[in-house]
Amino acid sequence: MPQSPNNRPLRLRLPLLLVPGLTAVCLAAAALGGAPAPVRISEAAIPNEPGEESPGGSATTRDSIDTREAFSHFSHGIGLEGEAKFKVGNAIFRKLWVSAPSSTTSSDGLGPLYNSRSCQSCHLKDGRGRPPAANFPADTAESMFLRLSIPPQNDEHRRLLAERHVNTINEPTYGEQLQNIAIQGLDNEGHMHIDYKEEPLALGDGTVVSLRRPTYSIEGLKYGPLHPDTMLSPRVAPPMIGVGLLEAIPEADIRTRADAGDKDKDGISGRTNEVWSAEHNKVALGRFGWKAGKPSVREQAAGAFAGDMGLSTPLVPNPSGDCTAAQPACLNAPNGNTERDGGLEVGAKLFDHVVFYSQNLAVPPRRNFNDPAVNRGKTLFYALRCQSCHTPSFTTGKVEGQPHLSKQKIWPYTDLLLHDMGEGLADNRPEGMADGREWRTAPLWGLGLTRLVSGHTQFLHDGRARSIEEAILWHAGEAKSARDGYAALSKADREALIKFVESL
């Protein structure tokens, strides 16, 4: 964020925003550019639609959402057989894996290099991860990872990228992801270090909000230097709720919202990410991950087992995880592949249970649905055109064997498309068709329960935002006008908009 020469908070240049029936407020302009023409926003209330209080349709949980287990309930209508399968998947999701060989052969195979011993350690109570609180060694950052890649170095690299067989070219020594933990007898790869710089920003009414800008580095590299062109991208583990419903949205309904060339000239140009499906051996629509780099829950789960824990699955059968040719001791370490599990560490049956569990983590119902302040916030959300990317609703298609997820009107507030979010949030690291400034629109359902479930309120792909307000103020690029509109609102209206988002 730019600062004034005297180091006072930057005060955005604000033209008049005319809102019928309201006191005139100011609209934040482009950082230091000229003021746009006055904008009129209708104050017409946005009515609540039938069923909107149940964002997951009939699959929305009916269980209590007043405890840390609010994200850990199974989808309503799952049936007795489904409930039993869900509970087995839950046990595997929370299991602490150990290195091989071990007397507990059903739980060994961890690593050799890894970031976490369980799925639950990353997805805190099935919710959102967080950046390390105080850096290593005070915090090992189990729920935040550092992705690594390099630009294509030769024709083979360029071919693989062009044909979508890979999303990135891995760093040659350290692979796709920095692993900060190793099994006994091996060195870990190093540790992520974060430095934050506080940058004050003055809003239209004079309120000053401090945003923290992170800088990432790696300390204690154990296997030699990084490639000189290495690109780093931090990733916090996202919430798990509703992913089966997102997977059930018909592909055509997502594609129809894409507008890569902004043909309608509304300033919003969402794009799909086209990625390789190892399961189907073809290019497919990306849906999951911060840049929509995975096409399905199965492939997202397999990638996490391999990269985060070093465990082999039917889709990623390599037991060495993210080890590279530059790490022979890692490649030659004992593994937990067993005949019982089809020569894998996470056999097909175990893997299917984890996938089913993930697909059926239920969305919680709306809170404070009829609160006047929440409804006022909804009006402002639409007035600022936040819904242009955070698409309120879809109807799911047919899900084979899971009728409770089928034909449901859901309210995830995402379009699952890639959008340019500006230089401030850019990681400058392409992933598939996503460039360094693009991110997939994050679903908003359950956002207001983050503190209860995960014990914090840190948002965005790297957890830099310490509140919903900070997350909004980091928006730029295609979301700049919405961010500027938010910055121009009165304190009461900003609070109302946040109450609406917290109610989803």
Regions found by a protein language model. Give the residues of each.
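N-terminal secretory signal peptides that target proteins for export/translocation
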Residues: 1-12
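Periplasmic c-type cytochrome electron-transfer domains
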Residues: 2, 29-504
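Intrinsic structural disorder/low-complexity segments
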Residues: 6, 20-21, 393
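Hydrophobic alpha-helical segments, especially transmembrane helices
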Residues: 12-14, 495
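Bacterial N-terminal signal peptides
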Residues: 15-30
